[in-house]
Amino acid sequence: MKKYDRGWASLETGAALLIVMLLIAWGAGIWQDYIQTKGWQTEARLVSNWTSAARSYIGKNYTTLQGSSTTTTPAVITTTMLKNTGFLSSGFTETNSEGQRLQAYVVRNAQNPELLQAMVVSSGGTPYPVKALIQMAKDITTGLGGYIQDGKTATGALRSWSVALSNYGAKSGNGHIAVLLSTDELSGAAEDTDRLYRFQVNGRPDLNKMHTAIDMGSNNLNNVGAVNAQTGNFSGNVNGVNGTFSGQVKGNSGNFDVNVTAGGDIRSNNGWLITRNSKGWLNETHGGGFYMSDGSWVRSVNNKGIYTGGQVKGGTVRADGRLYTGEYLQLERTAVAGASCSPNGLVGRDNTGAILSCQSGTWKTSGSLNGSYTNLGSHRGSFSGRNSGGSTLFIYASGGNGGSAGGACANTSRLQGYVGGTLISVNASNNPAYGKTAFISFAVPAGTSYQITSYPTENTSCGAGVFSVFGYQT
């Protein structure tokens, strides 16, 4: 190789490594931003839950809070109060991830003192960055989400509103959360607690539900479409178009040529609900249910999903598409790094919780950079090998002198490295004036062959060179 060509291989390798490092740094930044955003979204949900509990508390205790607040002096609601009254679960923490504590400040409306308004404010702890405040304000779903940037004013998401904290008798600092509960919001909360609505309210079935017995005072219920009940007790007759019954209807068995329609439950005390052919159970309203069309599978009608707040258990669970979890993946069985495994692609964990993956029939630590060096021996002329491992193999060769020819040949050297038949690295000197050795290194992808050759002079008059080889692999 000519003198002015020396170093190009090293320069190209260095440039490639620099590009890889830049890409890794860029990707790490993107991942960090994603993790931060998910954390802020979680915080926003917690604030929404807390605010919803405070709203319900105010609605339940509207009259009491009217008596303990003025237009300038607030009634303060704390997390402890919400937990003690059952509006928050007992496990709800007093502070958020930044050590900030939520409180609701309830005051009378200045224009109409008979009505209440409130501001939920966080205080103490470590301030959130502005980026987090803006994100959380937009993600808060109960009330009007906002934030405090100057320590004095609450500003709404997208700067849609701005209110001085002093209007609510609240105090906080910059980098904190604020949620506005308007007069209309709290009036609705008060109405929710003590009214039985005559009309359906979308998303609020509780407003059409009785929570105690109702006494009709011997008056009638007229124009009823259907009466659905668990039991019925009648002091007189039950009259219908097709039959009159003074007691229970009992029978050993019944046969019907067409349909059986029941206005209530169909119950079996000690038997099965048996169907034949490819039929099963169907919910007519929503078009879902279960059936069997072969001897192996219980199927969902119309490919409906199955939803439960409990546990789904089976010998194996298979997803033909993606597998999602809204929380964490718990791997109960442990494996040992370095032990054999099958098939490749399995994911497990060791007894410390570190993730392992099955690679080339061996459990390996995910992302591990620990490797080992292997002495691949001393060779003359050429050496061929293959990377049979599951990760990149790094080859290091030194020497390349034609010492057996003696004289000037002992001072010349040459090493050439090939990967998959392509020349990757060269280091050579034909100057016989002084002694020297050559050194080359190159990477070999998994499953790829490689070769090292050593013939010190271009016309090979000095014969084959002697060199040593080492390999490094994770």
From Swiss-Prot:
Name of one Pfam family that matches: Shufflon_N
Region (Constant region): 1-361
Keyword set, alphabetical order: Plasmid
InterPro entries: Enolase-like_N, Shufflon_N
Region named Variable region: 362-474
Additional remarks: This protein is expressed by a shufflon (= clustered inversion region that works as a biological switch). The orfs of this region share a constant N-terminus, while the C-terminus is variable.
Protein name: Shufflon protein A
Lineage of source species: Bacteria, Pseudomonadati, Pseudomonadota, Gammaproteobacteria, Enterobacterales
